[in-house]
Amino acid sequence: MISELKRCQDAAGDGYLCGVPNGRKMWKEIEEGNIRASGFGLNDRWVPLYNIHKMYAGLRDATLQTGSKEAKEMLVKLTDWMIRLISKLSDEQIQDMLRSEHGGLNETFADVAAITGDKRYLKLAHQFSHQTVLQPLLKQEDKLTGMHANTQIPKVIGFKRIAD
């Protein structure tokens, strides 16, 4: 499976690897700062950040569980792609994007930092930490009532992973 995914990533040419319909168009809009986020949608797509998180998590797991060098290289390329994608966005724009369900991207980016020793990926993990959830928790305030638990738990696991 990894070798077939690698063929897809290599064909993309820039490290991108994800199955979001018309994803290239959507990611280009985001890169340009055109962000339209809602609880589950981002730029008229259904949970694309959650979708790509699953790719990151799968590549991370293949790296850690099997020692696959190919999966590690793919994971790093995909993470570098994300760094380039958001490089011109403000913190506010990134936080706006995180209103859309995004899984545990902060956790996987922290894991990439641990795997590689590259602090750029830890910075990315911090950037993908949803402050609307994190800040009240840091103040020991419970603001989670009414929030979808399956959406919040991966974020909190990511906060913990960053702290480790």
Residue ranges with predicted function:
Residues 1-164:
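Glycan-recognition and catalytic cores of secretory/periplasmic carbohydrate-active enzymes
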